[in-house]
Design a protein with these regions (language model features):
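Glycine-rich beta-strand-centered segment in the early N-terminal region that forms part
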Residues: 20-35, 48-94, 133-135
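Short, surface-exposed secondary-structure boundary micro-motifs
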Residues: 33-35, 71, 87, 101, ...
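NAD(P)H dinucleotide-binding glycine-rich loop of Rossmann-like/cofactor-binding domains
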Residues: 88-168
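Mid-domain Rossmann-like dinucleotide-binding core that forms the NAD(H)/NADP(H) cofactor-binding site
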Residues: 136-215, 220
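Glycine-rich cofactor phosphate-binding loops and adjacent beta1-alpha1 units
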Residues: 157, 200, 204-280, 322, ...
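C-terminal hydrophobic helical "lid"/dimerization subdomain
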Residues: 245-249, 290-353
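Rossmann-fold dehydrogenase core element
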Residues: 256, 269-309
Length: 353
């Protein structure tokens, strides 16, 4: 089978590798049809290894058809269309027993620590797979996993019907945050970014307001929109130093601040504000399959979110040049999906990029 193998920084190759021949008792073998590229894939190529254990087949946002089932699996049958979650949990630790499988003490990720779905076939635990509704095509379904990450974050931030939310950073996962907030009935939904094209996309996804933070005072505008009160929830999705404090400045008393962006440098925060205004600060990690994947699929089935967040569909042989590099260089205008059914050109096989 063909697979995209990560060997280290700047080194991803499409190669022929053996098809998985050992399906665990609780696993399913999936014939992959579509796989979206995650920002973490481009980060590993650009400046990794960070989380990836090379060599490894990349890909943790994928869908396909069940080809084989383990003997303990009763939830799926051969021929079922499924989407897989990304994280594998033990099911027995304290966090798993609480339903917080994303915090599992033995958590690891498909496509980073074990072989993933940028390949013709992949083995995935049946417990993290969900059936795809008939009215959701494979390209759309390939977006369910990143959408689930956004929905999990919104749940952590207590984004809800009738409550206002500001989203700082609406590229990549930010578009899903906007779509999820709109689907949950939040109002107003305020998109904040430094890119007018991304802000235009956020408006198409249903944001009620769009603020370019390079030309406008975002905090002042949020306060003006909310009559000086601030929004109920703020999601910081950029990882840019200083933005957590801005999030705190625009949230209302008793509100919620969620840090979704990955901050690799220390930030200064006015902790007195948290105390005097009783603001809750939250982190968020990945998603919980049982809660977030079904909601993502339901929204994708009932909306045009997929069409609005999709940049393009490419072949596996185009992965590096037309997928990984545009993401690493911030040229991508949305999600990029790989079609595993497109023939791989002979001149692309074993190509190093």
């Amino acid at each position: 089978m063909k697979a995209a193998i990560y060997y280290g920084r700047g080194d991803i190759r499409v190669e022929d590798v053996p098809r998985p021949n050992a399906v665990g008792l609780d696993d399913v073998l999936i014939a992959v049809s579509k796989a979206a590229i995650c920002g973490s894939d481009s980060s590993e190529w650009d400046h990794g290894p960070v989380l990836a254990v090379a060599p490894v087949i990349l890909g943790h946002e994928f869908v396909g058809v069940v080809e084989e089932v383990g003997s303990n699996v009763t939830t799926f049958a051969v021929g079922d269309r499924v989407v897989s979650g990304a994280g594998i949990s033990c099911g027995t630790c304290e966090w798993c027993r609480e339903g917080r499988t994303n915090l599992c003490a033995k958590y690891f990720t498909l496509g980073l620590q074990v072989n993933g779905g940028l390949s013709d076939y992949v083995v995935s635990p049946a417990s993290i797979c969900r059936s795809i509704p008939d009215d959701v095509d494979d390209v759309s379904a390939a977006l369910a996993q990143p959408f689930a990450v956004a929905l999990h974050g919104l749940r952590r931030a207590r984004v809800r019907d009738g409550a206002g939310v500001a989203i700082i950073g609406v590229g990549g996962i930010g578009g899903f945050l906007v779509a999820g907030a709109v689907a949950r009935g939040a109002s107003p939904v305020i998109a904040i970014d430094i890119d007018d094209e991304r802000l235009s996309g956020a408006k198409k996804l249903g944001a009620t307001h769009a603020i370019n933070a390079t030309t406008e005072d975002a905090t002042a505008m949020v306060l003006d929109i909310t009559g000086g009160l601030g929004v109920h929830s703020v999601v910081e999705a950029t990882g840019v130093q200083g933005n957590p404090q801005k999030a705190l400045d625009m949230v209302r008393r008793g509100g919620d601040v969620l840090i979704l962006g990955l901050h690799t440098r220390a930030n200064q925060l006015d902790l007195l504000q948290f105390t005097l205004r009783e603001v809750d600060l939250h982190g968020t990690l990945a998603h919980v399959c049982a809660e977030d994947l079904p909601e993502a699929l339901a929204i994708l089935a009932s909306s045009n979110v997929a069409a609005l967040v999709l940049d393009k569909v490419i072949g596996l042989d185009e992965l590096v040049e037309d997928g990984i590099k545009p993401l690493a260089e911030r040229r991508a205008r949305g999600k990029i999906v790989v079609d595993l059914h497109r023939p791989v050109r002979r001149d692309a096989e074993s190509k190093r990029g």
